[in-house]
């Protein structure tokens, strides 16, 4: 998928919503626990309920890895289900990989060749040679952690150098000099919306993956105001506020309602910027 194709889908669905599949077996409705694969059953119901309102899904690998081989199987089957039933959806594997070159090459092969996801979150801490194996895959996107929504982001990401540049700004700026930088996206937390204007001066055209709207308290209005570009350039992720909106047999309908409400807000934002 290209960024143009992604933007076309955003315009068609009047949404830039990404639904995060942070599926915790301890939080899914009790009636699903009798299923052969409760995690997959929950995910299928959430996907079916929200696909109409979103353009992307982001399964978080840690929630599946915590279940061992059973969870890994659920992760793979979830991706297969999205790809088969909703082939227009952009799939982001939230795995936060990144290691020396040959190890990153194996990570890239796993996610882009075997699982066939569209994008993968990656840590840039080890530098260009740890990222280049991911960028070698045409049509696939590498989503670099830039400015995250957690409190600990202050520890390193907000450190300034002698010229006053934040570390996260340096990460973004230098990464734009790498080969195939057009395949980079960046994670910028919604709780850091005040920094989006400055980030857009560094990467006016790149897509930003923005978690933190919903349960974490980030403002969708602020994100759209300061982060949207001429091609939208945003994928706003919501996880808990959608998938755990209800814990009864009506959980999927409630999730659909939450996703629909966010989609309506996003449509207003897109119209305000004259993008649709």
Swiss-Prot record:
CDD domains: OMP_decarboxylase_like (cd04725). Pfam families: OMPdecase. This is Orotidine 5'-phosphate decarboxylase. It is an enzyme of class 4 (lyase). Coiled coil: none annotated. One of its GO terms (molecular function) is orotidine-5'-phosphate decarboxylase activity. The keyword Transcription regulation does not apply. The lineage of its organism: Bacteria, Pseudomonadati, Bacteroidota, Bacteroidia, Bacteroidales. Belongs to the OMP decarboxylase family. Type 2 subfamily.
């Amino acid at each position: 998928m290209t960024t143009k194709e992604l933007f076309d889908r955003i315009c068609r669905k009047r949404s830039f919503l990404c639904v995060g599949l942070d599926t915790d077996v301890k939080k899914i409705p009790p009636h699903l626990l009798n299923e052969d694969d409760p995690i997959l059953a929950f995910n299928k119901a959430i996907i079916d309920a929200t696909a109409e309102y979103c353009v992307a899904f982001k399964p978080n690998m840690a929630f599946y890895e915590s279940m061992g081989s059973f969870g890994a199987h659920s992760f793979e089957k979830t991706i297969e289900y999205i790809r088969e039933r909703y082939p227009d959806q952009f799939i982001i594997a939230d795995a936060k990989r990144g290691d020396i070159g040959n190890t990153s090459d194996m990570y890239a092969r796993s996610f882009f060749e075997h699982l066939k996801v569209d994008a993968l979150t990656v840590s840039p801490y080890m530098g260009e040679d740890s990222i280049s194996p991911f960028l070698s895959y045409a049509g696939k996107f590498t989503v670099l952690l830039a400015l995250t929504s957690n409190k600990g982001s202050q520890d390193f990401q907000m450190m300034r150098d002698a010229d006053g540049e934040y570390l996260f700004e340096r990460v973004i700026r230098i990464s734009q000099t790498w080969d195939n930088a057009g395949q980079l996206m960046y994670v910028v937390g919604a709780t850091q919306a005040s920094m989006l204007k400055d980030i857009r001066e560094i990467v006016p055209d790149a897509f930003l993956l923005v978690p933190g709207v919903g349960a974490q308290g980030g403002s969708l209005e602020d994100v759209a105001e300061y982060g949207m570009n001429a091609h939208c350039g945003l994928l706003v992720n919501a996880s808990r506020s959608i998938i755990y909106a209800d814990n009864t047999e009506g959980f999927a309908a409630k999730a659909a309602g939450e996703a629909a409400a966010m989609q309506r807000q996003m449509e207003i934002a897109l119209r305000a910027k004259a993008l649709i």
